[in-house]
């Protein structure tokens, strides 16, 4: 793995992408989300600080004045979430002036069983708090086994799920 957080630009969406910028180097990260809020750029990313490629447990916050900055500043309280049942990013959206972070919910022996939608209550370069407003579980009556991503940007809604099919 490259151990980088990379920003790509679509040259022919969704088929062709070009590397625009390496935002962070020498970091074991996954499921990074970058967004602008109150004239600052924020990065929420899952970092494995134990060097075991476990991206479930730690959510880290960084901020910068410019998206293309070479200086993403870590929040003093990093990791802002240290909890394997809550930390893993699973999507992001803004609605009615509110910001929402979606997290994966892991189940025993089941990666990405469900997701939770969390309203971000406070986000500054050194403060972060969120509260869970909804938990979304797979609809087992339809055969859905897992669902662990939801993202909405005003034009597109993206989510994933898996089904169990009888043989």
Question: For each of these PLM feature ranges, what is it?
Answer:
Residues 1-167:
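Carbohydrate-active catalytic/glycan-binding domains of CAZyme proteins
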């Amino acid at each position: 793995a490259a151990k980088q957080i990379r920003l790509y630009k679509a040259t022919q969406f969704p088929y062709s992408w070009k590397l625009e910028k390496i935002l962070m180097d020498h970091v074991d990260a996954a499921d990074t989300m970058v967004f602008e809020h109150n004239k600052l750029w924020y990065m929420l990313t899952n970092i494995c600080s134990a060097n075991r490629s476990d991206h479930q447990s730690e959510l880290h916050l960084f901020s910068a004045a410019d998206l293309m900055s070479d200086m993403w500043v870590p929040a003093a309280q990093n990791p802002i979430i240290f909890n394997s049942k809550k930390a893993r990013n699973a999507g992001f959206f803004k609605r009615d002036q509110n910001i929402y972070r979606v997290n994966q919910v892991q189940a025993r022996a089941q990666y990405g069983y469900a997701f939770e939608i969390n309203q971000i209550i406070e986000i500054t370069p050194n403060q972060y708090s969120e509260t869970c407003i909804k938990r979304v579980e797979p609809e087992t009556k339809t055969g859905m086994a897992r669902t662990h991503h939801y993202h909405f940007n005003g034009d597109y809604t993206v989510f994933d799920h898996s089904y169990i099919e009888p043989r």
